[in-house]
């Protein structure tokens, strides 16, 4: 059911954002797959993250929806303060209020227009131009995957994380359906970060 939900949401919002459908679809799969239906927070993701954090006995982290991330972007916060219980409660409260008061399209538009993609690139237009000398409308599916993957840790690359994402069935389907190949994706990471060989090793190819 989630596959159809993400696909329908991607079709809807890509038109509003003048952005390729495959970019929006990959963004949802990587960052917030229930964006179209949750009230600003994702109860399922919160429960999974809570169980994980209790097991790890560490700071609260994970499960942040696009609306929750937008709250952090607006405040310009980062680091441990964003993982404190008090901060998380404020973030949840604001994201639910914003999701009730604003349209989902406006939340998504503000997010992609302001979020940090690394290398001093804030917003999708700057990231597309800076990394690929492209516009948001001309992004290929390989470039879209790269940008969606970058959001979690824009200042560093994790070969393990990239490989895990490439192994997820919905992401793999979106990539192959739009003509992307594994060598093409790895070549892009090699060109930008020089980690192509490590990725091939990690993937066992």
Show where each model-derived region lies.
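Juxtamembrane regions of bacterial inner-membrane/periplasmic proteins
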Residues: 1-205
């Amino acid at each position: 059911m989630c596959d159809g939900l993400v696909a329908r949401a991607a079709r809807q919002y890509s038109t509003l954002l003048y952005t390729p459908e495959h970019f929006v679809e990959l963004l949802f799969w990587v960052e917030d797959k229930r964006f179209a239906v949750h009230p600003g927070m994702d109860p399922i993701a919160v429960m999974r993250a809570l169980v994980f954090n209790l097991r790890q006995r560490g700071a609260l982290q994970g499960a942040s929806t696009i609306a929750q991330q937008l709250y952090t972007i607006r405040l310009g916060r980062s680091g441990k303060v964003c993982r404190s219980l008090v901060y998380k409660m404020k973030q949840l409260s604001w994201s639910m209020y914003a999701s009730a008061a604003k349209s989902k399209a406006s939340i998504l538009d503000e997010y992609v227009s302001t979020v940090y993609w690394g290398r001093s690139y804030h917003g999708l237009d700057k990231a597309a131009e800076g990394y690929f000398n492209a516009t948001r409308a001309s992004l290929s599916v390989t470039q879209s995957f790269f940008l969606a993957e970058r959001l979690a840790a824009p200042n560093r690359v994790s070969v393990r994380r990239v490989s895990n994402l490439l192994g997820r069935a919905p992401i793999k389907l979106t990539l192959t359906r739009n003509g992307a190949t594994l060598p093409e994706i790895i070549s892009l990471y090699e060109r930008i970060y020089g980690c192509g060989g490590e990725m091939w090793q990690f993937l066992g190819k």
